[in-house]
């Protein structure tokens, strides 16, 4: 994982959890002068959510794209979309890292995780467009899919995405309705587990 945390209890908690799960955190910066960024999720009675982001002073944006030799052997390079909106220079580093990963033969997977609260900067939109061109595995929700393609229906949006010759799989997340997996050849609908949801964030 590439990013950054503050040298605070929240940052320590995150690093400890990642380490316990076997994640290599050697490319995570620890900055004693800045606070670990966070996102707060608010829930409403109708089941909708709103995200409040506190990333203005996050050390994560200081992370740099790793050198090519660091990525040797990497088969998939995953990008979490909300990181693109934390800082324009950080977004450029993310794109640079994805480009390096492609050059060594890795696949790029992209979960846009984009909220309307984060969109607006033209320069960031251009980086997003370039990242989409590199993407082999795309993991949007319905709202994100329509937002990113500018289309009115899911079918039109999926068709637009597959104009990218690099795209191999589009996994559309549909919440309580399960998900649909699209490839150029076929579409597969997945089933769902019938549960009483407690918290959908990060599920």
Set out the residue ranges of the language-model regions.
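Active-site beta-loop-alpha junctions enriched in small/polar residues
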Residues: 56, 82, 113-115, 143, ...
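Conserved phosphate-binding/catalytic region of the ribokinase-like
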Residues: 99, 103, 151-203
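Glycine-centered short loops/turns at secondary-structure junctions
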Residues: 22, 103-105
């Amino acid at each position: 994982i590439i990013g950054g945390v503050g040298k605070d209890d929240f940052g320590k908690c995150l690093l400890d959890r990642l380490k316990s799960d076997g994640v290599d955190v050697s490319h995570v910066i620890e900055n004693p002068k800045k606070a670990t960024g966070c996102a707060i999720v608010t829930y409403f009675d109708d089941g909708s959510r709103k995200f409040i982001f506190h990333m203005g002073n996050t050390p994560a944006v200081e992370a740099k794209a790793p050198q090519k030799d660091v990525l040797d052997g990497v088969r998939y390079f995953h990008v979490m979309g909300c990181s693109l909106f934390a800082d324009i220079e950080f977004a450029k580093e993310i794109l640079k890292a994805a480009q390096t990963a492609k050059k060594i033969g890795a696949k790029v997977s992209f979960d846009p995780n984009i909220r309307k609260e984060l969109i607006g900067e033209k320069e960031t939109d251009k980086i997003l467009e370039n990242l989409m061109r590199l993407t082999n595995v795309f993991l949007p929700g319905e709202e994100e899919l329509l937002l990113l393609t500018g289309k009115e229906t899911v079918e039109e949006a999926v068709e637009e995405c597959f104009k990218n010759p690099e795209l191999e799989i589009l996994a559309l997340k549909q919440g309580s309705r399960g998900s649909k997996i699209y490839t150029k050849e076929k579409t597969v609908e997945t089933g769902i587990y019938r549960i009483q949801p407690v918290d959908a964030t990060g599920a």
